Amino acid sequence: LAHKHLLYERRAKKLMIEHGFAPDNLYVFFNSLDYDVHKVLRHKLQALDKKDVFPFFTNPYLPVVIFIGRLTGVKKLDLLLQAVNQINDKQTNVNLLIVGGGAYKNNLEEQGRAGIQNGWLYFAGACYDEEENGRYLSMSDLCVSPGNVGLTAIHSLSFGTPVCTHDNMYHQMPESGAIQAGHNGFFFKENDAKDLKVKIENWLNLMDRQQVRKNSYEIIDKYYNPHYQLTVFNRLVSGESPEL
């Protein structure tokens, strides 16, 4: 076995300690994206107007739920469509933006045909322009990844948008550890569209958007960035004990 271990999350450290690993040999490194670029963009983008970012919605000022990532089966986006369909059953209360391409795109568009026709659902396709992705994320009110959530969580929180995903950590990616329930997002019961629907409604009704934006930035600025990762690596190679 290695002398030291770099781990993506605190949960991994807890599990390894339970299996007999020495805590001082386990360094939580977290994960990161292009933090410095995102930090510059976030200040520029949060002053935008929703009508300029979401011209494709009939009412762009409604709360916007976003998913960004590959449209694959493991993401279980059918659950998100079911939940938002239920929320909008009698009147349109929420917009849904899906950004990304993938094998499930045609199936999802077929499932969401009514939402597309009624102007509350939009498929933006794959987008590799980080400023455009930042516009979508920054002006959305909630990011939902109903299957597992990986770097999508870090991407969304980096632009001040809270994250929702399922609650079964045995079926999750490490980055789900960035979500602090009630602070910068929440969890719903795995594979339960009804619970997802209720949790989305409750969150959007009670959320203080500007406070949640600050909460979302906070965890990224503290841990999920290359500057913090460098301090962890330096502690490891110099023989210092882990911070976490």
Predicted feature residues:
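Conserved donor-binding/catalytic core segment of Leloir-type glycosyltransferases
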Residues: V53-K75, L81-V84
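Nucleotide-activated donor-binding/catalytic signature segment of Leloir-type glycosyltransferases, i.e.
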Residues: V99, N106-C127
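Short hydrophobic beta-strand element within catalytic cores of glycosyltransferases
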Residues: P162-H171
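Donor nucleotide-sugar binding/catalytic pocket of nucleotide-sugar-dependent glycosyltransferases
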Residues: L1-D52
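A structural motif in glycosyltransferase catalytic domains
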Residues: V65, L80-V84, L96, L196, ...
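A short, well-ordered alpha-helix in the C-terminal region of glycosyltransferases
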Residues: D195, N202, D208-Y223
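Acidic donor-binding loop of glycosyltransferase active sites
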Residues: R135-N148, T161-P162
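Conserved acidic donor-binding segment of nucleotide-sugar-dependent glycosyltransferases
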Residues: A126, H166, A181-A193, E201-M207
